[in-house]
């Protein structure tokens, strides 16, 4: 009996050793891949070690109020010859100054002067920084809390039909929003907003759009306003009213990513659900992809964006825990 057992063990021992070595190799490979941050199959992960708090850094944000709002009305109908319609939405009386054919180089030199030399809080300050390197200027007074449509157009006697071939030395239109009352400039951290707008012409027919928006702060910094990518709520029926509400919500998110905040109270029907648990409210922005798709409970379990699979370098919350507690209804 013992002899038969020893013979059987001798016959199967090579297969047993091979299986043990192969299993050890798979486990070791999984641990090494996980240590260096590569994707590892879920079966090799320890359920108690799926939080990546040491990998993803939480970016400290400072929220400030943005008194300016600017959008393009009917961008499909805009052109150099027919002009463009802009819609403003400002919290205080403001001035909208439009510069046609503004020099690209002089504009970015002006932004640097805002940081190192003098603050651009008035149209005259920007014009001094630009050294009048623009073709035409027009200015409009904007009343507070009133959405006004402003029609801007180059004079016909200029006979400008395009701004040359790409790459260009001039932007078609640069719109500057500043506070009209000097006292209001002491209230807000954001003292002006510069919008770079592309308008199609005979040479370059790219559709009309806002290329860049820069928020200029009283402390001397300026920040590029970036769009967040958020999935739409499918339970929500589109209408004219709902469209305006979505725009207001999107605007507040855009302002927050550019170090600004709009006092728009989030309604229940406009709330966005987490793409993972489908329950929690979306609150975290993942960088650098800018997908806004995770709630407070799920963000700690992800090292890669669940939308695009890009590795998350930094993240920040749209609302602090205190703000969320205020929004929650009190129950007895």
Swiss-Prot record:
Protein name, UniProt field: Cell growth regulator with RING finger domain protein 1
Pfam families, per database record: zf-C3HC4_3 (PF13920)
Biological process, per Gene Ontology: negative regulation of cell growth; negative regulation of cell population proliferation; regulation of cell cycle
Entry keyword Zinc-finger: yes
MF GO annotations: zinc ion binding
Domain of life of the organism encoding this protein: Eukaryota
Entry keywords, A to Z: Cell cycle, Endoplasmic reticulum, Growth arrest, Metal-binding, Nucleus, Zinc, Zinc-finger
Zinc finger (RING-type) residue numbers: 274-309
Role: Able to inhibit growth in several cell lines.
GO cellular component, one term: nucleoplasm
Subcellular location: Nucleus; Endoplasmic reticulum
UniProt-listed InterPro entries: CGRF1, Znf_RING, Znf_RING/FYVE/PHD
Keyword Cell wall biogenesis/degradation: no
Tissue specificity annotation: Ubiquitously expressed with high expression in testis and the cerebellum.
Induction: Up-regulated by endoplasmic reticulum (ER) stress triggered by thapsigargin or tunicamycin.
């Amino acid at each position: 009996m013992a002899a038969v057992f020893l013979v059987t063990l001798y016959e199967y021992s090579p297969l047993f050793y091979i299986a043990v070595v192969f299993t050890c190799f798979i486990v070791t490979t999984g641990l090494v891949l996980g240590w260096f941050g590569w994707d590892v199959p879920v079966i090799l992960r320890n359920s108690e070690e799926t939080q990546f708090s040491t990998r993803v850094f939480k970016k400290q944000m400072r929220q400030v109020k943005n008194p300016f709002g600017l959008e393009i009305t009917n961008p499909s109908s805009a052109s150099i010859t027919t002009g463009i319609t802009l819609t403003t939405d400002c919290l205080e009386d403001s001035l909208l100054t439009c510069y046609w054919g503004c020099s690209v180089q002089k504009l970015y030199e002006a932004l640097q002067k805002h940081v190192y030399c003098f603050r651009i809080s008035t149209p005259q300050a920007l014009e001094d920084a630009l050294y009048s390197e623009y073709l035409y200027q027009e200015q409009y007074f904007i009343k507070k809390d009133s959405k006004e449509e402003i029609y801007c157009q180059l004079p016909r006697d200029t006979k400008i039909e395009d701004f040359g071939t790409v790459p260009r030395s001039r932007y078609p239109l640069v719109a500057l929003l500043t506070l009209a009352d000097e006292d209001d400039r002491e209230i807000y951290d954001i003292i002006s907003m510069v919008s770079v707008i592309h308008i199609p012409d005979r040479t370059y027919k790219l559709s009309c759009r806002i290329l860049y928006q820069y928020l200029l702060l009283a402390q001397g910094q300026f920040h590029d306003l970036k769009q967040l990518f958020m999935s739409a709520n499918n339970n929500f029926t589109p209408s004219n009213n709902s469209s305006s509400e979505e725009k207001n919500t999107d605007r507040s998110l855009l302002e927050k990513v550019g170090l600004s905040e709009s006092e728009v109270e989030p309604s229940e029907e406009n709330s966005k659900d987490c793409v993972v648990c489908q329950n929690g409210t979306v609150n975290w922005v993942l960088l650098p992809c800018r997908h806004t798709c995770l709630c407070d409970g799920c963000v700690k379990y992800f090292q890669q964006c669940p939308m695009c699979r890009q590795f998350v370098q930094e993240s920040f919350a749209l609302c602090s825990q205190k703000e969320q507690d205020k929004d929650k209804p009190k129950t007895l």
